[in-house]
Amino acid sequence: MKPAKSSPVQIARRGLMLVISSPSGAGKSTIARTLLETDRQIGLSVSVTTRQRRPSEVEDVHYHFKSVREFERLRDSDALLEWAEVHGNFYGTPREPVEQAMGEGRDMLFDIDWQGAQQLQEKMSADVVSIFVLPPTMTELQSRLHRRAEDSEEVIQTRLANSRAEIAHWREYDYVIVNDDLNAALDAVQSIVKAERLRRDRRHGMFDFVRELLEETPSL
């Protein structure tokens, strides 16, 4: 008679804050969307923003769209973990849903710029895993912005002008990926997430597991 299979070992851990940044058009949103579709342990931190909603975007799914006055009220009441002004618009991360998810062991994905990433590192560095996505060339970056066909030519040129300043912050991130092949870039991000979830200091349930393991008396 074969012995019954034991249940998979479940070790409690604290959720991680996965930050993915890049200049517009480098691929962070596509990578983020694919992660959310394929990994049930990851939830999206939905940012608040004052920018105009694009035709393809859904309220409270892609962003919480707010007026400048509403945004300032959230910021001034300490309801945002981080905030930044990007391309003339305000963006910020609501505090409450993130802290709740982290405490329950769920990972939160942040599609934010270097300013937001910097603020999160300053406030919650032990929880943050940051990834910067680079385009293979500036020419390809420009082509992707045109293919997206969601912004005017004026907006595209503004994004290109700002991209060099954004790229200059790549050294501030834990990991850097060149997105010349989307599948390869996605594989790299998934590998990072798997490894970071196994870090000893993130798995607070490991202490009890090891203690019980050492106290166990084997029985045949």
From Swiss-Prot:
Family indicated by similarity: Belongs to the guanylate kinase family.
Reactions that this protein is recorded to catalyse: GMP + ATP = GDP + ADP
Originating organism: Rhizobium johnstonii (strain DSM 114642 / LMG 32736 / 3841)
Protein name (Swiss-Prot/TrEMBL): Guanylate kinase
Classification via PANTHER family: GUANYLATE KINASE, GUANYLATE KINASE-RELATED
SUPFAM superfamilies in alphabetical order: P-loop containing nucleoside triphosphate hydrolases
GO cellular component: cytosol
Its job: Essential for recycling GMP and indirectly, cGMP.
Source superkingdom: Bacteria
Principal subcellular localisation of the protein: cytoplasm
The EC number(s) this enzyme carries: 2.7.4.8
Localization: Cytoplasm
